[in-house]
Amino acid sequence: MAGHSQFKNIMHRKGRQDAVRSKMFSKLAREITVAAKAGLPDPTMNARLRLAIQNAKAQSMPKDNIDRAIKKAAGADGENYDEVRYEGYGPGGTAIIVEALTDNRNRTASNVRSSFTKAGGALGETGSVSFSFDHVGEITYKLSVGDGDKVMEAAIEAGADDVESDEDGHYITCAFEALGEVAKALESSLGEAETVKAVWRAQNNVPVDEEKAQSLLKLIDSLEDDDDVQNVYSNFEVSEEVLAKLSA
C-alpha cells in the first residue's frame, strides 16, 4: 500500500474496525490451529505456532481462545486446512493478493471470484500479480520501546532491511527467509515484538481516484468478511484529499 499509516487510516474508517474485529479472533484461531497441526503443539518447539500465538496476543485474544485453538489441532475429527493464494485485478488495474486457509477450496475460490466480479475486477492465475510484490518479513514494535534512532540501530544490527516509524509504532522489514533470525535478534535488544509475520509489499503503487478507491474498499471489505480469507494485500494509492474523505 501507500505506506502503513495511509492504509491503516483508510481501513480504520468509521464503523469498519468493529466489523473486522468481530472476525479477527476466528481467523487468528485458524492460523494457530494450522500451525499447531503442522508441527508440535509446543510453541517453544514450533516457530510458526509461536509467532501465531504472539500475533494473537497482540490483538488481545483471550488465553482460553488460544489454548482451545491449539487443542483443536490434536482432535482426530479436526478440519484440515489448505493454504491457498489467489491473485487478481481490482478497479483501476490495481493488483490484489488474497491469502486463505480453507477446508473447501471450491467454496473459497467461488466466494473470492464472486467478490472480484461484483467489484468490477477479475480473478487471475497464480503468479499473475505477485511478481509486482515482494514477499518480506515484517516485525512491528510499539513506540514505547524507544525512538526511531534506537529502533533503526537495533534493526541494522539484527540484519533488517528497512524501518518505518509513525504515530502508531515501528515497522521493521527484512527478507522473508531471515524473518525468524531477525525477529530473534531484535527480541534480545528491544524485547518481544508486537507482531511478526510475512507480508506482500507492493513494489510500486497505482494511484486511484475517489470512485475507484470506494470500489476497491468494498472489494477488500467483501474479501476480508470471508471466514476463509486471512490476509488481503493491494498496491493502490490515494491522494491526501481522497484519504480524508475515505477516513471520514
UniProtKB/Swiss-Prot annotation:
Compartment(s) of residence: Cytoplasm
Any one GO MF annotation of this record: DNA binding
Gene3D superfamilies in the record: 1.10.10.200, 3.30.70.980
Keyword annotations of the record: Cytoplasm, DNA-binding, Transcription, Transcription regulation
One Pfam family this sequence matches: Transcrip_reg
Record flagged with keyword Lyase: no
Single GO biological process annotation from the record: regulation of DNA-templated transcription
Signal sequence, renumbered to the chain: none
GO cellular component: cytosol
Keyword Zinc: no
Family membership: Belongs to the TACO1 family.
PANTHER family according to UniProt: TRANSCRIPTIONAL REGULATORY PROTEIN YEBC-RELATED, TRANSLATIONAL ACTIVATOR OF CYTOCHROME C OXIDASE 1
Identification of the protein by name: Probable transcriptional regulatory protein RL3983
Species this chain originates from: Rhizobium johnstonii (strain DSM 114642 / LMG 32736 / 3841) (Rhizobium leguminosarum bv. viciae)
